[in-house]
Each structure stands twice: as structure tokens, then as C-alpha cells.
């Protein structure tokens, strides 16, 4: 073999080895990955972090995927609260991190405090050692029975959240003492990765919704496919808007990007409402007059909070939903509603007078689109236009509820708006012909005139359906009108 051919062969072998190494991905230490020898692989970065929880340093090491790395939230430290390192070589996160030590001017410990500081850790270490020995022996006995780890018990051994606290406690603590934008990211990730999925409860254009369990509590897990990353990121961003939390808006818990090496799942964890969507509820149930008013008032309350701007250092921007429909509203145990599915929502910055519209090709549901959206005359530079479109959609939802209201034993069967005018899956052209050209609206049955509550609801619907968006009611006006009706009907909403 000539020297030239030998050199070419060596170069080829080197390139093959380099390609194989790149294909294998970056290997990192992962403290949560005991099933894979505490190792994970990623195309992003290795991640190590330490945070202060109940006065103790809690360390976590894992992989950060490319979407998480691009989001620029995992590689930033917070003074005296968290210290985070991201690196890009194999096992580079196998390092020891510590938070900054207290200042020299801190008061010295007395003899009693010093005794406690020394004694308590020694006792805890002894207990931990005994528990570790016992756990190892017990694991050897039970491993043959099942390979499925009880992640809810594992959380008690390694967790970034306080033992014995419920999700409501954690969310209340974060809302009361933090920025009001939800749980810390590390806590969200810990919760999401220790949820046990139970059964699938729904499917949509985004993916699937599962019923899950976390430490004995029910949660809902909305699982997006990787191709819907924009929808997942946008919805998580909107839900974590400061001061958004409200009893009539779906309670957000956590968001996480779960990558098992072959495919990626994008999780959105929220409160679980076993009665399902308003669409499902109305298909199954007939409602009383008081029940109708109670449902309608809770929807108006949630939408009014969403539309309202709260001014201040911990303020909230005005938000428009853009996809209000009965399938995007959930019914709680107390028979009130919570508005959900904020993936298409827009935010308004009143200071800069700008509208934050998501970069998402999907639009709202055609059947519920306002006339100005159907005929493309909506002024997208004015935020009020989006709020007015929401009001039109709410009027259609109220029509669905009112049809299921029993008055004198008479009740209509459940139907979608415009069920008798367009096909089951109408196009924009078909909806535009009915709503804009023919100026038709859902029919209000004559028997509604015999009931004051239904007469009021019918008037609200008509004032929500005006072709001129500026003439429609505001969410706050709808809320006040139905509140007065609620007092008359003694619905105790």
C-alpha cells in the first residue's frame, strides 16, 4: 500500500469515528435516571443545578434538550437562590456546585444553635444511611415482581418540593411569595417527571389529554407532539402570565419537555376536572334555570379577568382567547366553568401599544368565528378587535347552554351553533355565506319568552352577535348583567 493510500484510509476511519460519536449524542450525568444507570443523552447540553429548599441545598443533574436550551431559562442562575451550569462535553456536569456562603457580617451561632446544627445533620445522615440500606435490600426482593418504579414514593426520597404539601399549597406559596407567575421551573420539572399517567380522556388537533396522578392527587396532562412545539410553548407562556390565576380559568401546574432518546413529548400539566368539557357536560345533562345562570356567570367572570389589564409592578396584560367554544371550557365539580386552551391567545402591551400574536399557523374554530374574521375585515392592529371576537363566540356558547335549560318540562336536545345551516365540519366560505352574507344567527325558541332568565340570556346573546363588533357587549358588562340575574334566581354562583 502506498503512503498516499494509507493516509487517505486513516482519514476516512477518523471521519467515520467522528460521525459515530456525533450520532451518539452528548452523554450526561442524570440523577433522576436511575433506570439508565444515572446517564442520559441529548443533543443540547449537560445541566447541573443547586437550589436552596428549606434551608438545604438540593442538587439536580440532567440533560437539557435543544428546545429547552433555546428557551434560555435553564442555564441562568439566580443570586443566592439557584446556581446553574450548562456545558457541552460528555459527563461535564459531574461537578460539585454550592450556593454562595453567607456574608462575614452574619451573626455567629451560640452554643445551643451550634449543637443543634451539628447534631441534626449527624442524626439525619444516620437515618438516611439506615434507610438506604433498607431500601437496597427491599429493592432486591421486589425487583422481580415489577420493573415499574413507584415514582410517587421516589419523590419522598429525592424532591425539590416540600413533603406533605398538596399542589394547592405549592401553588398558593408560589403565588403569595413569588412573582405570581407559577411554580419555579425546577419544581415544575420535578412534578411533571413524577406523574403516573392513568388513562386517556380526550384527543384533539394538538395531541392527547390524559388523567394522571401525582402524590395521590388528580392532574390533567395535555401531551403535544414535537411538531406542535409552538402551541405548547405559547400555551405554557400564557398560563404563566403574572396574575393570570383565577377560579374560572384552568389552573396551570407545570410544563416539561420529556425526551426518551427516540421521541419527544411536550407536557402541559393542569388541574383535573372529571366532568370534562362543557360540550360533554351539555350532551349528558339537562340544566336548571339556576344552573344555566351559574354556568354563564362563571364563563363571563373568567373571560372578564382574561380581558382585563391589571396595572402595577405585578400587573397582568390584557389577554384575548381567540378560540372560545364549548369544547375549550371545562366544568368543575361545583358546576361552574373554567376557561382552558390558551394556545392561540394574544397579549396586549398597553405601554408600547403592541399586540403579541403567536407565530402559529392555526386559527380558531370556524363555526365560532366572528363575522369580521370570516370576511377578513378585522383590524388586527387594534386589540379591542380580538376581545370583541371573543364576545361573539361566548354568545354562541350561551346559546348551547340555554338550549339545555329545562323550563316547564320542555328542553331542547343539544346541538352545536348553526347545526341546521352548515355541515358538521363547515368551511370558512360556508360560514361566511351564512353569517356575513345572509346575516343569520342561531334561532331563539319562542318558549324562552315564558322565562325571565331565558329572556335576559336571549337578549345578551343578540347583543353579543352584532355584526358590528364595536356594538357588542364587553365581558365585564355581560358579567354584571348575569350577576344581577343570578341574585334574582338565587343560584349562589
Swiss-Prot record:
The chain crosses the membrane at residues 114-134. SMART domains: GS (SM00467), S_TKc (SM00220). It holds the Pfam family TGF_beta_GS. One of its GO terms (molecular function) is growth factor binding. The active site is at residue 323. InterPro entries: Activin_recp, GS_dom, Kinase-like_dom_sf, Prot_kinase_dom, Protein_kinase_ATP_BS, Ser-Thr/Tyr_kinase_cat_dom, Ser/Thr_kinase_AS, Snake_toxin-like_sf. Disruption phenotype: Acvr1c mutant embryos develop normally, with none of the known NODAL-related phenotypes found in these mice, suggesting that Acvr1c is not an obligatory component of the NODAL signaling pathway, at least during early development. Acvr1c deleted mice however develop age-dependent metabolic syndromes, including progressive hyperinsulinemia, reduced insulin sensitivity, liver steatosis, impaired glucose tolerance and pancreatic island enlargement. Residues 1-25 form the signal peptide. Expressed in interdigital regions in developing limb buds. It is a single-pass type I membrane protein. It is found in: Cell membrane. Residues 165-194 form the GS domain. Serine/threonine protein kinase which forms a receptor complex on ligand binding. The receptor complex consists of 2 type II and 2 type I transmembrane serine/threonine kinases. Type II receptors phosphorylate and activate type I receptors which autophosphorylate, then bind and activate SMAD transcriptional regulators, SMAD2 and SMAD3. Receptor for activin AB, activin B, activin E and NODAL. Belongs to the protein kinase superfamily. TKL Ser/Thr protein kinase family. TGFB receptor subfamily. This is Activin receptor type-1C. It comes from Mus musculus (Mouse). The lineage of its organism: Eukaryota, Metazoa, Chordata, Craniata, Vertebrata. The gene is Acvr1c.
